[in-house]
């Protein structure tokens, strides 16, 4: 099914990409270009948009980048990416919050619905189609993609438990859903709750069957109806805007709009109740979309609806926002049983080796990826690992459960285990690297 009514915005500015705990591996590489099974992260996003049927010839995908990363990302899209998705870049010269970014690109968002996703998300295209169908069918103002909990992977090494606990809280939300309709009525980040969670009792009057979850993850993929952009535009014109961050400010406001006659700090635009109007109709009007809000709001407030789309547990979705998740998605794709695959050809023994690599198949175990022009020395052993492009691995090196990026040199008799070795790193002979993240 072609998604002609939806325009996509990818926030690839690193800092605008939500919470991220990938230091130090993203210190010298733009977040959206981090290699996953030897493919840049953004390539997976462009692939799932294409598979989901997004038509981008008239309205391209908008990728928001900052000045420091724009050249590398533009180079990948223009010179290496071979897919059908059309892309338009918007370069930020200063650091802005997510609502401010949407205000800056307001003239580029021209369709009835717009989808905002962070540059760290990889998921199956089926979920996007289902989410888009839900948004249209229910005439939703906001649709949020939520992910059920995944089995925890044991972390090893000093400080693993403490770090994991802090990160679990960082990515935990208190989410209230009306069970029958799957309307989302509250979403509060755990980091914003100091002691007790405040729950608006008026919600129970209109949503009596509500369940509060602490184990659903906000994937930071949102679909908005076009009127929400009108709301942001008018808010940003105020001396003291209310909306800066999509998750912290805009979404709680939209959720509260589902309660009739609630007192609001910002009025809703008239376009909120005529969601099928085109942008040309809105732009050609000589009146503000807020001019007729007072009586209209009182009568039609109930038409504001916000929904959650819950992913099925058997489907694949990963936010690449922690090192643990980064390692996991590399392992997942190297297995070769997802809809996403490395660019290297797959062998009968379930590994992926580029034809230009100087490797003997007895050196490489299953679920490994070996990149372009990489050389393995005599008696090397590679198990459950990713090795990037133009790497030189010496004799007798053992690599297991690790990610080796591009242009890495590892001398003879080294042991690399459960580590990430970033671009251009040089490792001396006889070194042992276990559970480390090495950068140049």
Curated annotation (Swiss-Prot):
UniProt-listed GO biological process terms: cytoplasmic translational initiation
Subcellular location per the Swiss-Prot or TrEMBL entry: Cytoplasm, Cytosol
Principal location listed in the UniProt entry: cytoplasm
Annotated InterPro entries: eIF2B_gamma (IPR051960), NTP_transferase_dom (IPR005835), Nucleotide-diphossugar_trans (IPR029044)
Keyword Hydrolase tagged: no
GO terms, molecular function: guanyl-nucleotide exchange factor activity; translation initiation factor activity
SUPFAM superfamilies: Nucleotide-diphospho-sugar transferases (SSF53448)
Gene Ontology cellular component annotations, sorted alphabetically: cytosol; eukaryotic translation initiation factor 2B complex; guanyl-nucleotide exchange factor complex
Keyword annotations from UniProtKB, A to Z: Cytoplasm, Initiation factor, Protein biosynthesis
Subunit (UniProt): Component of the translation initiation factor 2B (eIF2B) complex which is a heterodecamer of two sets of five different subunits: alpha, beta, gamma, delta and epsilon. Subunits alpha, beta and delta comprise a regulatory subcomplex and subunits epsilon and gamma comprise a catalytic subcomplex. Within the complex, the hexameric regulatory complex resides at the center, with the two heterodimeric catalytic subcomplexes bound on opposite sides.
Functional note: Acts as a component of the translation initiation factor 2B (eIF2B) complex, which catalyzes the exchange of GDP for GTP on the eukaryotic initiation factor 2 (eIF2) complex gamma subunit. Its guanine nucleotide exchange factor activity is repressed when bound to eIF2 complex phosphorylated on the alpha subunit, thereby limiting the amount of methionyl-initiator methionine tRNA available to the ribosome and consequently global translation is repressed.
Protein family (similarity comment): Belongs to the eIF-2B gamma/epsilon subunits family.
Full protein name: Translation initiation factor eIF2B subunit gamma
